[in-house]
Curated annotation (Swiss-Prot):
Function as written in the Swiss-Prot or TrEMBL entry: Component of an export pathway for enterobactin.
Main location: membrane
Protein name according to UniProt: Enterobactin exporter EntS
Lineage of producing organism: Bacteria, Pseudomonadati, Pseudomonadota, Gammaproteobacteria, Enterobacterales
Cellular component per GO, a single term: plasma membrane
SUPFAM superfamilies per the UniProt record, alphabetical: MFS general substrate transporter (SSF103473)
Amino acid sequence: MNRQSWLLNLSLLKTHPAFRAVFLARFISIVSLGLLGVAVPVQIQMMTHSTWQVGLSVTLTGGAMFIGLMVGGVLADRYERKKVILLARGTCGIGFIGLCVNALLPEPSLLAIYLLGLWDGFFASLGVTALLAATPALVGRENLMQAGAITMLTVRLGSVISPMLGGILLASGGVAWNYGLAAAGTFITLLPLLTLPRLPVPPQPRENPFLALLAAFRFLLACPLIGGIALLGGLVTMASAVRVLYPALAMSWQMSAAQIGLLYAAIPLGAAIGALTSGQLAHSVRPGLIMLVSTVGSFLAVGLFAIMPVWIAGVICLALFGWLSAISSLLQYTLLQTQTPENMLGRMNGLWTAQNVTGDAIGAALLGGLGAMMTPVASASVSGFGLVIIGLLLLLVLGELRRFRQTSPVSDAG
């Protein structure tokens, strides 16, 4: 990255063929999973006319993902990571084929959809953990900030494209097309992933998988730096659950259907801008302090969002939250990867990703509870300002993270 530029440099895709292969595979995978994410709720709703059944499928898949992240973390620290990645992707694709075949039946099975959702949630997240653990070896720890920013852009771009494509396919060909293309896309990702070099794990004694996972929890609690990073990540994810209040807040602002879409687009847009303007972030001497301040700032943006007098100001607050949370997330990712021992990378990445899954669910549940006692405006504001207070307390308590200095700021090869 050019030291004089705030803009993200994409040269890592040119100089590191292995990372380029991962970038391509991840983008195709995100689009494929997006097609699945559109098709499953629509098919269940059409079959059952029950939003509860749709919610059950999401809950079951989320539970399978959580277990997959835990198991994947242990496997990524025990077995050659390339094999784990390929096995997880291939097995996940088999589940997509099953969904496609089921959708083509005269009477599709609801039980099959639930079971295959569990299958795909487990194996998809298992591969994600191994891929995250392998990233430092693919790009070098000095390039992790740049790699994280490029990955964030990939996720945001894929998350925008896949629902649009999924909706078009549903309108023109039905859910079977979504499942079929998701399966094809998943198997296509195996082609670039096959070009990856071997990714062996450091030699370490064999131990019971549960004891290995317990060792990761002990490390997390014993290391204030890594523990603080994980805690901040969970709180930021909880704050992003404010989206469950968008429909109710849109009514108070008298927004049209088209304008409501801007609320949902604001945070991803802000996050994309944060990734694009992260050029100097890798050279910060006090990344921990920047992480803490940007996290508190993002909570403040959520607190101000709902009390804005006009919806445009609310959208700006959400975009600001997206930008600040992207800065915090990039620093979390980089410090986690650089400060975690190699033999713990799989399990720590699994735990860090799992707190994103659970943090979102906890945040949505808390906002739902607040919504039962107060207005949507009050719910969003109380949650945001409450998190500001917690963030300020953590700014004081997490001294090791606040004082952490990079003796030689991360540089990149670009």
